[in-house]
Design a protein with these regions (language model features):
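FAD cofactor-binding and catalytic pocket of flavoenzymes
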Residues: 16, 144, 310-434, 441, ...
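FAD-site-proximal beta/loop scaffold in flavoenzymes
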Residues: 481-505
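Glycine-rich loop(s) and the adjacent beta-strand/alpha-helix scaffold that form part
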Residues: 81-84, 88, 95-100, 105, ...
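N-terminal glycine-rich phosphate/pyrophosphate-binding loop and immediately adjacent elements
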Residues: 13, 47-159, 166-170, 309-331, ...
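A conserved FAD-binding loop/helix module that cradles the flavin
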Residues: 515-534
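Extreme N-terminal leader/targeting segments of oxidoreductases
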Residues: 1-30, 34-35, 39-66, 84-85, ...
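Conserved redox-cofactor binding core of oxidoreductases
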Residues: 2-14, 20, 166-261, 270, ...
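Residue-level detector of alpha-helix initiation sites
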Residues: 72-73, 297, 512
């Protein structure tokens, strides 16, 4: 059924990820959008308006109204919203342009081409935390699971109490609705749900726990479970197939394979950015407004390189620490068949714990489980009989992003004792659910821990202290390093992403979050970008993109 769904989708759509916005895309293109379609690296055709590193033969200099650094959830949304209002927008993306038809189940290739550092970023600490960032046109939305949830009301209330303006539920409602409409947010078609998700659901329900179907940005997902390698059908509504083509159709220009090195300034006002393509050619963009949406690691790094001075810049990193239990079943699970993460166990949200099942390709799984040599080989030999699941924790500790001479951008993170205890609790709960679903044994995410074969063994093992240094922790949700606050002493930007003390400079990604939100952050990023784009346009209509 899943493969039939995939074939039907491909036949119906032709894997076309052109402009999804209907009449809005009929507007005559401007600038580079009207030139002949070039061929990018590897000979692939790219849309009008996109310039890749393979197209560039010399240094380039361009002018625009707004330059956006980054093409992920925040950057692409901001670009599309501004372009729709008639603003001349240039988007710069460090990663490459990879169309839907180039995506396959080859996860090693995906790690090389779609992720920064091959998906092997590291926040140094005890334990160190492995993290992954997308680095391609569309950003991390190309390689995430497409989970789309509104910011929890309690989080918005906390932000409001901390003095962030216009982030109450009523304020954010129209932006959530717009984000969900633009990105086809809804429930998964039931025939595409895989057995790994069903097993976690069954085990949780057997224990009487609350389980909810996941809300995802998808349009009749085919259930190929290739989310982390790029959706091969275009059904996942990443920025690559939504806001990027929408912005291009409205006249925006996009330069891929180009790293922005610095934001240029004249006094307190920005004047644009400078950067280099992967093959060394320089790009200079002159613009009175710069929007930085490079993610919670690269955004503070770029701001710091560009002379932004704030006591909060690069601090307050939250990352929703995750860990994974590997459960072995007697019968085949074939977790790679079916949608990525179909359900969420929400029984323990008040404790700051969210439990999910997420099948991971072997190269990615190998990086986050404490199995080596023969044990790892045996695990992979049983790959078709395993369920990988685990907790996401709302962290209370924080980390920091720093530019260190000779070492580049470095990340540091402190897992607090309460957060470590929360993860251990999440591992025990996950194990209880999977044993209730019929698991025969489990590997736990702690170095040196033996396999457990019963709920009693699990309970007894975790009743003893688990050294933090032994924990295998990873993250895909990075946030908070350029947080919003009306008080420059407490935040890098104001409530709408305008950087304090610099005219024309904005932030539009999860760096803005004043703290962790305890849920997948993509829809929050999109909604805030839509909200902040509107405020930017209002300021522009008042005579300037940013008041002095």
């Amino acid at each position: 059924m899943i493969m039939a769904r995939k074939r039907h989708y491909l036949a119906k759509t032709g894997r076309d990820h052109g402009n999804p916005s209907g009449a809005a895309g009929e507007r005559a293109p401007r600038g580079d959008a009207g030139r002949q379609v070039p061929r990018g690296d590897a000979g692939r055709r790219v849309p009008r308006g996109v310039t890749t590193g393979g197209d560039v033969t010399g240094d380039l200099s361009v002018d625009c109204d707004v330059v956006v650094v980054g093409s992920g959830a925040g950057g692409a949304t901001m670009a599309a919203e501004l372009a729709e209002a008639g603003v001349d927008v240039v988007v710069i993306e460090e990663g490459g342009y990879h169309p839907t038809e180039s995506f396959t189940a080859d996860s090693m290739r995906a790690l090389r081409t779609l992720y920064r550092d091959g998906g092997g970023g590291m926040a140094v600490g005890r334990p160190s935390v492995l993290f992954a960032e997308g680095r391609c046109v569309g950003g991390s939305t190309v390689v995430n699971g497409g989970m789309s949830w509104r910011t929890p009301a309690r989080v918005l209330e906390r932000w409001s109490a901390e003095g962030v303006l216009a982030v109450g539920e009523r304020d954010m409602e129209p932006y959530f609705e717009r984000a969900e409409s633009r990105h086809s947010v809804g429930l998964q078609d039931p025939e595409t749900i895989g057995r790994d998700s069903e097993l976690l659901k069954a085990g949780a329900q057997a224990r009487g726990w609350a389980v909810v179907p996941n809300r995802r940005s998808q349009l009749h997902c085919a259930g190929t479970n290739n989310c982390s390698s790029g959706c091969p059908t275009g059904a996942k509504r990443s920025m690559l197939v939504t806001s990027v083509p929408r912005a291009l159709a409205l006249g925006a220009r996009l330069y891929a394979d180009c790293r922005v090195d610095r934001i240029t300034r004249a006094g307190r006002a920005v004047t644009g950015v400078t950067g280099r393509f992967a093959r060394g050619q320089a790009l200079t963009v002159r613009a009175p407004t710069v929007v930085v949406a490079a993610g919670a690691i690269q955004t503070p790094a770029l701001l710091a390189r560009s002379g932004v001075r704030s006591g909060q810049l690069g601090r307050n990193l939250a990352l929703h620490p995750n860990t994974t239990v590997v459960a072995f079943f007697d019968s085949e699970v074939t977790g790679w068949q079916g949608v990525h993460q179909a359900f969420q166990v929400r029984e323990f949200m008040a404790e700051g714990l969210l439990l999910t099942a997420q099948n991971l390709p072997p190269p990615m799984l190998a990086g986050i489980v404490p199995a080596y040599g023969r044990e790892l080989g045996e695990l992979m030999a049983d790959y078709n009989r395993i369920v990988t699941a685990g907790p996401l924790a709302t962290d209370t500790g924080t980390g920091r992003v720093r530019n260190i001479p000779g070492l580049g951008t470095q990340v540091f993170y402190r897992l607090t004792d309460p957060d470590a205890a929360r993860l251990v609790r999440g591992v025990e709960l996950t194990g209880q659910a999977l044993f209730a679903a019929g698991a025969r044994r489990m590997l736990l995410p702690f170095d040196g821990a033996p396999a457990v074969r019963s709920p009693g063994e699990l309970r007894n093992l975790l009743a003893r202290p688990v050294p933090k240094a032994s924990m295998q922790v990873y993250s895909i949700h990075l946030m908070g390093t350029a947080r919003m606050s009306e008080d420059p002493r407490r935040g890098v930007t104001d409530s709408f992403g305008a950087v304090h003390g610099v005219r024309g400079l904005f932030v539009a990604d999860a760096s803005l979050f004043p703290g962790p939100i305890g849920i997948n952050p993509m829809e929050t990023v999109i909604a805030l970008a839509m909200r902040n784009a509107r405020r930017l346009l209002e300021r522009r209509a008042d005579g300037g993109l940013l008041p002095g």
